[in-house]
């Protein structure tokens, strides 16, 4: 029966396919809205990685799952895997350690400081485009080697954590002492929307300005690379030019010169490069472009064995050390022992070997017994010797092995944890005790927090301080909205708004900010003086509470009695705990919530609003209600009146939406101010309002207008206030990883 059923079903399927073939083709050729209206504001960044996309469900909490994990057992399994070479992808030198180090490095190494995107959190290396980047060739096999371990521990360890932890275990299994490990990287379930560049071809580079500088927020020199081309800028083997690019790209990952040298020298102590054949003649499509039968694997190599001694990855070929699966000083030793000359790999890529044929038999082959090679270096390796600053560091490390080892351990820890945010998010027993400046340290809570009665009394004192509702709201928003969810930095905790550099950011209106902070500091000091029993309140808490009681007052004046939630427990950081240059990248070039826009902005005002909302992890309705509420509260930067569509500024009314949707107003571009619009009465021609594109997009964009109509309806006021408070509270607590 089975033998006849299958062909019958196949014939039926074929007949149906032929019958409905026209419809299938039509579906494949659907033309989306973005084609017809390419300038239409894209709201999709605010809809990515929705809770509904998570197969574990809304009740799943990764931190709790991770805490139940026996990390020592996981480590034991990973160590065993290191030397269990698989026939379908044999280990170089019988050890997968170097392969897993590359996997972990390339997972974390896409992090960039300017927008906080990239990094190991989310496990994005599993998804396009990262899973198919030229710089990630064959890392699909590394993750498949790890699948049995991921399968065993399931929801208790994320791919993001597993990849980094495996890199750590790999280092330890080869004799290196790591600095520590922290779990806490929650997996994503779809590819993150990231601007990786506008190039249309791999390894192309069209990301520099007229001065030759890499455009922000890019972190790599070419499309599809993690950092730089190892052969030199655009393949030109110039070590000094390579050093310049290395310094720039690693700096964009928050690494200084010493950390950069430690990472490159430490990482290249292990493993080898793979360029046994010409990729153009041997290597097939990347994972994303491969057929379903490949099951997510790519770069199939048709030459020789297709792996082992025939492996093709970067096209460069060889090892740096004679013992590539052990921690040694050989990388730096050989770098300075030999003079290096250019040669080409079997794949035709430029690399370097010792001059005069020296050390021709120093390096054992990774797979063939009794076969040996000369050591090799990339152009980017020679850069560490030729650049004067890098040379000073490498020679010092060569003379001081323990200093080098600690520098690499700390740099590796920073590389793999930089995108996790503050230490409060770290999980596990291997978290190092030392507090590091790049972790944006905040003092641990050292006092009893105030209770509800204290909160009410403090709120009344803030309202009696002479500060206005707009001033309190603007200050609280400026403090809390510095948060960015891409790398969990910024936010109200720490009260860094009173420190350099935040206190002088243009968007924060420094003159007004100084006045408000002075009054709030006095309130804090006086109130703490009245408290007993070890209770205190931080300035960070006072700033947030000030905004919250101002919102309550504004809602009451609009006829809605509400209580804005407030959770004390924030602490105040010091200037010594604040790296000014590191925090400088958090400065907003635009903040549509405050109608602030500067000439340094990379996109239009409306697009920058979406970017800011995305950083704050807001949804489309949350963004909409916050903009409308902040306009009604008169919270624009520097008090500008654009978008304040109300005759009762400082009151939490839905007037912004009511008046935006009012057909008695006719909008036109201002003839006096570029980028400003004027709303005039259709009958009298009298000027009623002024607005920015950020204001008007809530009436012009069909989806945003749909949300605005909810809040602008006659029954919308109560909903508006309640939704505003929920969204406000979300922003105020965005960095409260302790609650």
From Swiss-Prot:
Signal peptide region: 1-26
Name of the featured protein: Catalase-peroxidase 2
Summary of the function given for this chain in its UniProt record: Bifunctional enzyme with both catalase and broad-spectrum peroxidase activity.
Record site: Transition state stabilizer: 102
Post-translational modification: Formation of the three residue Trp-Tyr-Met cross-link is important for the catalase, but not the peroxidase activity of the enzyme.
Active site: 106 (proton acceptor)
Listed PROSITE patterns: PEROXIDASE_1, PEROXIDASE_2, PEROXIDASE_4
GO molecular function: catalase activity; heme binding; metal ion binding
Source species, domain of life: Bacteria
Subunit structure, interactors included: Homodimer or homotetramer.
Cross-link entry Tryptophyl-tyrosyl-methioninium (Tyr-Met) (with W-105), positions: 227-253
Alphabetical GO biological process terms: cellular response to hydrogen peroxide; hydrogen peroxide catabolic process
Enzyme Commission identifier(s): 1.11.1.21
Residues at which heme b binds: 268
Encoding gene per record: katG2
Swiss-Prot/TrEMBL cofactor(s): heme b
Catalytic activity from the UniProt record: H2O2 + AH2 = A + 2 H2O; 2 H2O2 = O2 + 2 H2O
Cross-link (Tryptophyl-tyrosyl-methioninium (Trp-Tyr) (with M-253)): 105-227
One GO cellular component, as annotated: cytosol
SUPFAM superfamilies: Heme-dependent peroxidases (SSF48113)
Bound cofactor: record note: Binds 1 heme b (iron(II)-protoporphyrin IX) group per dimer.
């Amino acid at each position: 029966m089975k033998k006849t059923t299958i062909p019958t079903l196949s014939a039926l399927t074929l007949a149906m396919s032929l019958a409905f073939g026209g419809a299938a083709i039509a579906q494949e050729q659907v033309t989306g809205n973005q084609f017809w209206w390419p300038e239409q504001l894209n709201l999709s960044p605010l809809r990515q990685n929705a809770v509904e996309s998570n197969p574990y469900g809304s009740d799943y909490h990764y931190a709790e799952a991770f805490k139940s994990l026996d990390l020592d057992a996981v480590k034991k399994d990973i160590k065993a895997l290191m030397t269990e070479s698989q026939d379908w992808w044999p280990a170089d030198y019988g050890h997968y350690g170097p392969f897993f180090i590359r996997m972990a490095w390339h997972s974390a190494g896409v992090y960039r400081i300017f927008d906080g995107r990239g990094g190991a959190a989310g496990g994005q290396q599993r998804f396009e485009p990262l899973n198919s980047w030229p710089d990630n060739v064959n890392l699909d096999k590394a993750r498949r080697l790890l699948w049995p371990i991921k399968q065993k521990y399931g929801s208790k360890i994320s791919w993001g954590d597993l990849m980094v932890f495996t890199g750590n275990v790999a280092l330890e299994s080869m004799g290196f002492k790591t600095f520590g490990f922290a779990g806490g990287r929650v997996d994503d379930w779809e590819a993150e929307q990231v601007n990786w560049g506008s190039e249309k071809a791999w390894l192309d580079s069209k990301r520099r300005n007229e001065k030759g500088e890499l455009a922000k927020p890019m972190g790599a020199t070419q499309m599809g690379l993690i950092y730089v081309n190892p052969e030199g800028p655009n393949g030109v083997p110039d070590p000094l030019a390579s050093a310049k690019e290395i310094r720039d790209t690693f700096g964009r990952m928050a690494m200084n010169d010493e950390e950069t040298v430690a990472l490159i020298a430490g990482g290249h102590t292990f493993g080898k490069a793979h360029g046994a054949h010409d990729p153009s003649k041997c290597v097939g499509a990347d994972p994303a472009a491969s057929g379903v039968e490949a099951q997510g694997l790519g770069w199939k190599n048709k030459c020789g064995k297709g792996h082992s001694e025939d492996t093709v990855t970067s096209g460069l070929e060889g090892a740096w050390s004679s013992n590539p699966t052990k921690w040694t000083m050989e990388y730096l030793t050989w770098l300075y022992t030999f003079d290096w000359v250019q040669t080409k790999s079997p794949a035709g890529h430029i690399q370097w070997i010792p001059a005069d044929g020296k050390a021709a038999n120093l390096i054992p082959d990774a797979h063939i017994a009794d076969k040996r090679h000369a050591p090799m270096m990339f152009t980017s390796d020679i850069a560490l010797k030729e650049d004067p600053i890098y040379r000073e560091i490498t020679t010092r490390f060569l003379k001081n092995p323990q200093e080098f080892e600690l520098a690499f351990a700390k740099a590796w820890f920073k590389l793999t944890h930089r995108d996790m945010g503050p230490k409060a998010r770290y999980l596990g027993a291997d978290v190092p005790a030392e507090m590091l400046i790049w972790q944006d340290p905040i003092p641990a809570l050292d006092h009893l927090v105030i209770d509800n009665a204290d909160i009410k009394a403090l709120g009344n004192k803030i309202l009696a301080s002479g500060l206005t509702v707009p001033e309190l709201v603007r200050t609280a928003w400026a403090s809390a909205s510095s948060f960015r969810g891409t790398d969990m930095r910024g936010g109200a905790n720490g009260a860094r708004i009173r420190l350099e550099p935040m206190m002088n950011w243009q968007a924060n209106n420094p003159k007004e900010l100084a006045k408000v902070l002075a009054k709030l500091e006095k309130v804090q000091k006086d109130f703490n003086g009245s408290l007993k029993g070890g209770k205190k309140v931080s300035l960070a808490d006072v700033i947030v509470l000030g905004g919250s009681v101002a919102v309550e007052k504004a809602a009451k004046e609009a006829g809605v009695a509400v209580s804005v939630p407030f959770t004390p427990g924030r602490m105040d950081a010091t200037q010594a705990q604040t790296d000014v240059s590191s925090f400088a990248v958090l400065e907003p070039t635009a903040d549509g919530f405050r109608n602030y826009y500067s000439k340094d902005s990379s996109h239009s005002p409306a697009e920058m609003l979406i970017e800011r909302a995305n950083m704050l992890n807001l949804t489309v309705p949350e963004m909409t209600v916050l903009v409308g509420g902040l306009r009604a509260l008169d919270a624009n930067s520097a008090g500008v009146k654009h978008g304040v569509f109300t005759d009762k500024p400082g009151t939490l009314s839905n007037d912004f939406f009511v008046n935006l949707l009012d057909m008695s107003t006719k909008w036109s571009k201002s003839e006096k101010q570029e980028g400003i619009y004027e709303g005039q009465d259709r009958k009298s021609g009298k000027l009623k309002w002024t607005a920015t594109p950020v204001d008007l997009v809530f009436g012009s964009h069909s989806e945003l207008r749909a949300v605005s109509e909810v809040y602008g309806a006659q029954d919308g006021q109560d909903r508006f206030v309640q939704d505003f408070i929920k969204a406000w509270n979300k922003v105020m607590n965005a960095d409260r990883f302790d609650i």
